[in-house]
Amino acid sequence: FYWTGIIDDKLRVFDIIMYTEFGTTYNSYVMKAGDKTVLFETAKAKFFDEYLEKLQEVIDVHKIDYLIVSHTEPDHAGSVEKLLDYSPQMKIVATGCALGFLKEIVNRDFVGIPARDEEKMVIGNRTLRFLFVPNLHWPDTMYTFIEEEQILVTCDSFGSHYCLPEVVSTAINNEDDYQKALKYYYDCIIGPFKPFMLKALDRVEGMDITMVCTGHGPVLVGDRIKSVMKQYREWSTVVNPNPRKTVIIP
C-alpha cells in the first residue's frame, strides 16, 4: 500500500473561501492486490505531471485495473480524465451519483461500476467494503474499507489542510498547529453536515481500523484515529437541539 499524493505547501487559499496557512496535500493511494492494481483518489489536474511521476515510481500507469473515486471534486478526481489516456481499460468504482457527475466531468467513455452501500468487492487478494456517507460533504461521497489491511479511506472526513511531508500522523511535531488546522477544516467542510457526520461515526467507530487514509493532511494511525473520531463526535453533537421548525416574524 503506497501514498502517491501531492504536497502543496505554498497554498494559502483553498476553494476561494478557506485559508490554508499550513498548505495542504492531495492524498492518493495505490494498493497492489495480487496481480491487480487499485488506485484510490487522484490529484488536481494542475499537478498531473508530478502526480504521474509519483505513480510511475510504484506502478505501470498503463496497467491500472481499478480506480476508486470517493467523490468527484477536482482536488480528488481532477486527474481522472488524463489517467484514462494511460489506462483506458481501468474500471472506475464510485457511487452512482459520483459516476453520473464523472461522466459530465471527463466527457468521454469509461467503464464505470456503481458501488452499493455495504457491498463487498473482491479485487485480487483484497476485499473492499463500501460505505455510503452522503453529504460528507457532497452527495456522492463514500468511504472504502480494505478488510485485510483494516484501512479506511475516508475522502474528506477526518482530514485537514495541513502539509506534512512525512505523511503519517506520528510525524506531527507541532500539535497546536495541527489542531488548529483540523478544527478549521472540520468547521468549513464537515460542520454544516453534523447529523450526517454522526451517522457516519456510528458506522465506523466500532470498527478495527489500523489506518485512516484521508483526502487531505496526515494519514491517521495509532491512537490518533480514535482521538480524531472522538473530536469529530464532540464537534458534531449539538447541545439542546431544537428539532422543531421555527419561524421568526419581525
What are these regions (language model features)?
Residues 11, 47, 72-77, 99-102, ...:
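Active-site environment of divalent metal-dependent phosphoester hydrolases
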Residues 36, 46-93:
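Active-site metal-binding motif and surrounding structural segment of the metallo-beta-lactamase
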Residues 211-240:
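Terminal amphipathic helices with adjacent charged low-complexity linkers/tails
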Residues 240-246:
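A short, charged/proline- and glycine-enriched loop
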